[in-house]
Amino acid sequence: MADSQNTQSSSSASGSYQVPAYERKPGVAGKISSVGSDTLANLMTFWSQEFKTLYPQVGFQIQASGSSTAPPALIEGTATIGPMSRELKPSEIRDFTRTHGYPPTVLKVAMDAIAIFVDRRNPLPGMTLEQVDAVFSETQFCGSNTAITNWSQLGVDDIGYRSPIRLYGRNSVSGTYGLFKVMALCDGDFKNTVNEQPGSASVVLSVASGTGAIGYAAYGYKTAGVRALPLGESLDSLIPLSIDTVRNETYPFARFLYLVINKKPGEPLPTLEREFLRYILSQEGQQQVLRDGYFPIREDVLVRQRRLLE
């Protein structure tokens, strides 16, 4: 653990920021229950394991069935924290507010991107956003007039890629599913040939297991068997998925990852919950984000999130 006086400095157009190292506090014990995103499952595990090395008397229960399971658990009081890979829907905010009398507090804790994965041998250099819609969508609301069902329509005619494209994606309780539907399909409908998987790891494994497959999933689950395609408005302006293009949000499907909590306005959080969130929004917590293959939030954003805990 870094010394508590160490800080990580950064500057932006709006000023200079200090991201503090985490400082251990006395008397932290209890149990945290987390219900929500599969995308954040590994990261929640990393955070909880490292936090337990600081506070052995703390226990965690982590359930990762999808972002849509987080709001009901917070409303019913069966979860302390609700990890989500998408923003809350207006209806979810209304339901929470109706129950508790105030809205939920939403913290940005990491950055991710929804990647379009192909197997590592696939020669496709990249895709336009219109092509992505034409591959995955039944309705093609993003502008394409022709559905894409074969690799030859994307300029790939190598042996092994002459059969119809096999499609993989997430199931409907996933925040990744809902966000991809909005961002990539212009809120259209998925083709019924998309093989829905319970987790991003399953999507990546399916794409890597044989030629001719393509799938969308959280970039943090990338393996050596797949490649994330550059994307853009045109084939002449493809943007690779990298830490820079995600953090500056130029990659088309960049997104924040969130933790939703129940914080009554004007009252402090319980000590255990506050300290766990302070750890996440510290140098050490953001190092775990990198460890899991995601991207730390910009320092100016992080400082704003820490203020929400006050």
Language model regions located:
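Flexible loop/hinge segments at secondary-structure junctions
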Residues: 2-310
